[in-house]
């Protein structure tokens, strides 16, 4: 498998530290608000990576953290009067619900910063003992001048605008220096004084706590992932701390997904063009949004448009219509050529768009073969297995097709539709075909189509 290693600025052959085992850390959200499309892009991109590695036979340990103590959360507390736990628990629950709707596999580890304070404090003590951290009136800071490898991950330099635009840095020795522990009497006890951890320190401590091989003094993990907006300074600062604390690299590979754009503008709250995943899920099934996110390469800047979302739904609908055709058939063996085609595309730095093109071709071919030979049980069994493979690797076409096609219909509406179908069944039994047709027309006006099967009528919501 080849992946793009941001720190190398090129595609490289992926070779895990321990053969057959892969450790991945994904920077998760700061939980002060609901998940937006950028969070979804990152989660889906590296969920795909995890699925592909598992399909290739690797045992994967996957961690995704929650930053649950941060200035933004404190601001939310001041605005709402709610406690830290009330705010963070609420948005963690919302985030997990949203990611579940996108078929993102639950991580093996979901550490929260506030649950790892002992590890964070111990880590800061190591940095202080190494002489690479210093104290000011407002906190403990990391001395970036002690790291000759600073900028090695991001490839930036001291002339970058991100550095130059800092006009004043108070008691810090250098504008690049960052806080490890922020003094604040309202928060947590530590040997340095009451306070709370700095963002850049939390992730390193959690990686060491949950993914590193501490028993054998092996700190390095295989892959550190996140959005490209985290590359500098966040990931640069993480890597720098690890080198200075343990004289070891934090991660062998660094992977980053691209920005989200909305109508060709970068999505951001300042531009008032960001939107929440929960709002998108009111209008489309979660798998549609996942499919749409997969149509663009994970490193590309993803440009959201309603038209492209609709196009993705139409492509996914075709997969579900095939699933409907083979409903009730026991899975056989997946076609090895098809499996190889999928994995070959995805092993090339997660080329999901190429993999989806292979899926499109499979669906087209399957429908043609079933049209020509609808009683071919062996082929139907192969189709079911291929569909299961698509679900396993790409995380789509997992839902029951009835549920998928009935998305967006309320329970109250479903009850009303079922009453009409029951009435229609009685009318047909009594050979009152005029009434049966009236009910079909009434349902059509509700944007509902019905199909008669040996087991009774089934219905679905049409595209509007």
From Swiss-Prot:
One of its GO terms (biological process) is cysteinyl-tRNA aminoacylation. The keyword rRNA-binding does not apply. Keywords: Aminoacyl-tRNA synthetase, ATP-binding, Cytoplasm, Ligase, Metal-binding, Nucleotide-binding, Protein biosynthesis, Zinc. Zn(2+) binds at residues 27, 203, 234, 238. Its cofactor is Zn(2+). Its EC number is 6.1.1.16. SMART domains: DALR_2. ATP binds at residue 269. CDD domains: CysRS_core (cd00672). InterPro entries: Cys-tRNA-ligase, Cys-tRNA-synt_Ia_DALR, Cys-tRNA/MSH_ligase, CysS_C, Rossmann-like_a/b/a_fold, tRNA-synt_1_cat_dom, tRNAsynth_Ia_anticodon-bd. Belongs to the class-I aminoacyl-tRNA synthetase family. HAMAP family: Cys_tRNA_synth (MF_00041). This is Cysteine--tRNA ligase. It comes from Campylobacter concisus (strain 13826). The lineage of its organism: Bacteria, Pseudomonadati, Campylobacterota, Epsilonproteobacteria, Campylobacterales.
